[in-house]
Amino acid sequence: MADNARPFYRVLQTSSSHEPFEVPYRRLANDRLNAFAYTDSCVGDFVKRFRELPQWKNTVIVFVPDHLGAYPEQLNNQSVDRYQIPLLLVGGAISEPRRIDVYGSQHDIAATLLAQLSLPHQKFVFSKDMLNPASPHFAFFAVPDLFG
């Protein structure tokens, strides 16, 4: 990446915070929490190293999980909390830190990012700009015996 002067798009997916929770890291006795701590440390190291590259100033890194996960173990499958996941936008191209509490889903990432770049996103008919206050803020979910 250090030699790349042209805009680029990359995807990196981790699976260290998924079962069987076996990671090369031993900080916590609970295997699940230890795997989450390992993932957090790797993400932190990645961002720390990327900040040192010249591309950082023009970069947006998107962090989003595929689903909530396996913790807390007692969380009810019918609870809204079970389906709330973070979307983090990090990078030198982000003007200032802020927290925005709206409902959305992974489908909405495309329209949200394209809108920030002032690019058309109408062809993404199932995606909405989560940062637009006029957008309807909802998220669809479906699991066995439950949807909403």
Positions of PLM-derived features:
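Solvent-exposed soluble domains appended to multi-pass membrane proteins
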Residues: 1-148
